[in-house]
């Protein structure tokens, strides 16, 4: 059974987040949590929060035991960009 958790519009670049996501792909849940806790990257708390959300979804919504869970798939896509306007004379 596949359990899903989604995080949208995170305030960090996808390139930095992909580095952390590659570390836990295919790992056991406990091993992935340990890796994320001790990784000194700025994206690791965001990915750890998302992983905990996926674990909570599995245990509460689907009544699955968290000892048998692993990270099957994790991917990072680019979100919306902030458009900034600088009001000044342009000519």
UniProtKB/Swiss-Prot annotation:
One biological process term in Gene Ontology: translation
Cellular component GO terms, alphabetical: cytosolic large ribosomal subunit
Keyword rRNA-binding: yes
GO molecular function: rRNA binding; structural constituent of ribosome
Keyword hit for Ribonucleoprotein: yes
Keyword tags: Ribonucleoprotein, Ribosomal protein, RNA-binding, rRNA-binding
Pfam families per the UniProt record, alphabetical: Ribosomal_L22
Matches recorded under InterPro entries: Ribosomal_uL22, Ribosomal_uL22_bac/chlpt-type, Ribosomal_uL22_bac/org-type, Ribosomal_uL22_sf
The family this protein is said to belong to: Belongs to the universal ribosomal protein uL22 family.
Subunit text: Part of the 50S ribosomal subunit.
Record's function text: This protein binds specifically to 23S rRNA; its binding is stimulated by other ribosomal proteins, e.g. L4, L17, and L20. It is important during the early stages of 50S assembly. It makes multiple contacts with different domains of the 23S rRNA in the assembled 50S subunit and ribosome.
PANTHER family tied to this protein: CHLOROPLAST 50S RIBOSOMAL PROTEIN L22-RELATED, LARGE RIBOSOMAL SUBUNIT PROTEIN UL22M
Protein name: Large ribosomal subunit protein uL22
């Amino acid at each position: 059974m596949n359990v899903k958790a989604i995080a949208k519009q995170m305030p960090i670049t996808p390139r930095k987040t992909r580095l952390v996501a590659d570390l836990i792909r295919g790992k056991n849940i406990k091993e992935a949590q340990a890796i994320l806790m001790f990784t000194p990257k700025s994206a690791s708390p965001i990915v750890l929060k998302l992983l905990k959300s996926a674990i909570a979804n599995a245990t509460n919504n689907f009544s699955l035991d968290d000892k048998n869970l692993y990270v099957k798939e994790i991917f990072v896509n680019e979100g919306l960009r902030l458009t900034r306007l600088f009001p000044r004379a342009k000519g």
